[in-house]
From Swiss-Prot:
Entry protein name: Arginine decarboxylase 1B, chloroplastic
UniProt-listed PROSITE patterns: ODR_DC_2_1, ODR_DC_2_2
Cofactor: Mg(2+); pyridoxal 5'-phosphate
GO molecular function terms listed in the Swiss-Prot or TrEMBL record: arginine decarboxylase activity
Recorded name of the encoding gene: ADC1B
Keyword Lyase assigned: yes
């Protein structure tokens, strides 16, 4: 299988005025001679005369670093998806902008009419990730003469989506891939899916357990699923012994060891002696003794451990695996029937493309290095202790699912500091109204601007603004004059070559719903425009979401940046048809599961896209509209149907009391009721194109196709196309 190496074409150099993400400095601002500002069309001239290519955008956003081998920039300036990684042929690449247009175009134009935000899943990438992980371990096992095999386990908590889990079971059945569950619902999900998977695939039961959980796990064992109950707490052992005897089931038991090895990275708190889960060495000895007394020591077959998520280096990995392998060998010495060593999670991904051991957004290794380190560490300890090599497992959920999912959202507007311009007469009038101190600051500011003294200009501009604010508070300046201060300061800033202020781009998204890890733990994800990458970005901006919360913004980006290079928005938004689309990548793990309903913004629409031989190289195999306003209201225990009836009754009263003809009253009522019904059926997000509105669509439905033209499944779905599902106006 292809190696997942990340490289950046060193031959591409940044155009004037830009630096790449890994650069630590930018060119010094140009000082205009005699303080005279450049012509207002200079920026446009620079943009058109300086050649800008997709390769420049790829380097600017470090796409070849974090995106390889699945994402690149094509010759049209769009993000291109390589569903089979390095084995993707040129005609198999998928233009992401074409996928977005297919999803969002109205149905009467051949689109699906889905509303943003939109999650696009690529199951082919999921398959490639599984195969690459298995291939890396297979190579390590073969090259090092390891006398057992590797079989992975997917922790469903990373992304419990039905199709994601089913795809993993299907794609992994040929190499005994299993599932891990940490709760009773996840266990039920895993049991059902593994009925179609490999019989050797493990069903690892982690998390806190009560009698019901353990009974369910033992039922799975009865159903011939290869189920292992992993002891996270010492007291769980008594329940396992008692319930297994009552059910007459011989359990497979694992235990989670609390290692001393700990890493100090972003997720280091999940590891070490003070980690949330696991048994100390003292507890492990007691568990072994109790199992021996119960005649069940042969049931203990698996050792599980977790060094921590996003393990930064192979040195730390080798240290932790070596410690765990010592515990494994000791369990063998004590008589346990050991067969498996489960490395847990920790296989990291490179969010910023730097391959750095010192970054919370990166890791200093690839899949092959990870696999080789694990195999070598286990083999070394077992050979020294003369212990049979165990089957190696890992729960590498983040590494499996992160790449396969892309979040697409629109920038709908931007906030700029367009200050008013003053004529010489207005300027003279403004200056006359300033107090002596403010007037002195203005004169000093003008003089410093003529001399081109940037730092001095900033000082006097700040002082002038502050003094004018104080005058405004005292009632000595009106609001127009206060606004004029910004215009003066902006003019001077341009005259001395100061950089343009960072803009705020308003995006049709809830960060709390779709990117919760950014808000909660400062996790950074690569965010880039998915089109216009053959054009030079003209501004820098931060992203502000739709929520009524000051935390609902993204002002930190990979590469240590506090703003993102962006393109100018047109009069109706971005470039193509007034749209400007951004993509958040590598967010396929955890983000959907952790997202909440802040401001009652629900989840995104979801599109499942497979590579095909069709003209555009892709087929939509599943489309799920995002939750409607009614759906999210219902999730908070409201009753949308009753709410609709209440509002419809109020509308009827309002129309009845109006001084209109009876015929007009009927039309007015029908219009109001229809508008209310539409509001309940629409998604909570902004509808930037009325043709993309999801009225008259069953939001709870799934739609499938085998080609690019989507078709409904069953008469029920087809009938639902033409009705406002629960809110029909009689």
């Amino acid at each position: 299988m292809p190696a997942l190496g990340c490289c950046v074409d060193a031959a591409v150099s940044p155009p004037p005025g830009y630096s790449f993400l890994w650069d630590s400095s930018l060119p010094a601002p140009e000082i205009f001679p005699s303080g005279v500002p450049l012509s207002t069309n200079t920026a446009a001239t620079t943009t058109t005369t300086t050649h800008w290519s997709p390769a420049h955008s790829s380097a600017l956003y470090s796409i070849d670093g974090w995106g390889a081998p699945y994402f690149t920039v094509n010759s049209s300036g769009d993000i291109s998806v390589k569903p089979h990684g390095t084995e993707t042929l040129p005609h198999q690449e998928i233009d992401l902008l074409k996928v977005v247009k297919k999803a969002s175009d109205p149905k009467n134009s051949g689109g699906l009419g889905l509303q943003f935000p939109l999650v696009v899943r690529f199951p082919d990438i999921l398959k490639n990730r599984l195969e690459s992980l298995q291939s890396a371990f297979d190579y390590a096992v073969q090259s090092q003469g390891y006398e057992a095999h590797y079989q992975g386990v997917y922790p469903v908590k990373c992304n419990q989506d039905r199709f994601v889990v089913e795809d993993i079971v299907k794609f992994g059945s040929g190499f005994r891939f299993g599932l891990e569950a940490g709760s009773k619902p996840e266990l039920l999900l895993a049991m059902s899916c593994l009925c179609k998977g490999s019989r050797e695939g493990l069903l690892v039961c982690n998390g806190f357990k009560d009698a019901d959980y353990i009974s369910l796990a033992l039922v799975a064992r009865k159903l011939m699923l290869n189920t292992v109950i992993v002891l996270e707490q010492e007291e769980e052992l008594d329940l396992v012994i008692d319930i297994s005897r009552k059910m007459a089931v011989r359990p497979l038991i694992g235990l989670r060891a609390k290692l001393r090895t700990k890493h100090s990275g972003h997720f280091g708190s999940t590891s070490g002696e003070k980690g949330k889960f696991g048994l100390t060495t003292t507890q492990i000895v007691r568990v072994v003794k109790k199992l021996e007394e119960s005649g069940m020591l042969d049931c203990l077959q698996l050792l599980h451990f977790h060094i921590g998520s996003q393990i930064p280096s192979t040195a730390l990995l080798a240290d932790g695996v070596g410690e765990a392998a010592q515990i494994y060998c000791e369990l063998v010495r004590l008589g346990a029937g050991m067969k498996y060593i489960d490395c847990g999670g920790g296989l990291g991904i490179d969010y910023d493309g730097t391959k750095s051991c010192d970054s919370d957004c990166s890791v200093g290794y690839g899949l092959q290095e990870y696999a080789s380190t694990v195999v070598q560490a286990v083999r070394f300890v077992c050979d020294r202790k003369n212990v049979k090599h165990p089957v190696i497992c890992s729960e590498s959920g983040r590494a499996i699912v992160s790449h396969h999912s892309v979040l697409i959202f629109e920038a709908v507007s931007s906030t700029t500091t367009r200050s008013q311009e003053l004529s010489s007469v207005d300027l003279q009038s403004f200056v006359e109204k300033l107090n002596d101190d403010a007037r002195a600051d203005y004169r000093n500011l003008s003089a410093a601007a003529i001399r081109g003294e940037y730092d001095t200009c900033v000082l006097y501009a700040d002082q002038l603004k502050q003094r004018c604010v104080e005058q405004f508070k005292d009632g000595n300046l009106d609001i127009e004059q206060l606004a004029a201060v910004d215009g003066i300061c902006d003019f001077v800033s341009k005259a001395i070559g100061a950089s343009d202020p960072v803009r705020t781009y308003h995006v049709n998204l809830s960060i709390f719903t779709s990117i919760p890890d950014f808000w909660a733990i400062d996790q950074l994800f690569p965010i880039v425009p998915i089109h216009k990458l053959d054009e030079r970005p003209g501004v820098r901006g931060i992203l502000s979401d739709l929520t009524c919360d000051s935390d609902g913004k993204i002002d930190k980006f990979i590469g240590g940046e506090s703003s993102l290079p962006l393109h100018e928005l047109g009069s109706n938004g971005g470039g193509d048809g007034g749209k400007y689309y951004l993509g958040m990548f590598l967010g396929g793990a955890y983000e959907e599961a952790l997202g909440g309903l802040h401001n009652l913004f629900g989840g995104p629409s979801v599109l499942r896209v497979s590579q095909s031989d069709s003209p555009h190289s892709f087929a939509v195999t599943c489309a799920v509209p995002g939750p409607s306003c009614a759906d999210v209201l219902r999730a908070m225990q409201h009753e949308p149907e009753l709410m609709f009836e209440t509002l419809k009754h109020r509308a009827e009263e309002f129309v009845h009391n109006d001084d209109e003809q009876e015929e007009d009253k009927g039309l007015a009522f029908a219009s109001l009721a229809s508008s209310l019904a539409q509001s309940f059926n629409n998604m909570p997000y902004l509808v930037t194109n009325s043709s993309c509105c999801l009225t008259a669509t069953n939001n709870g439905g799934y739609y499938y196709c085998n080609d690019e033209n989507i078709v409904g499944v069953g008469a029920e779905s087809a009938a639902a196309e033409e009705e406002l599902w629960p809110y029909c106006v009689a």
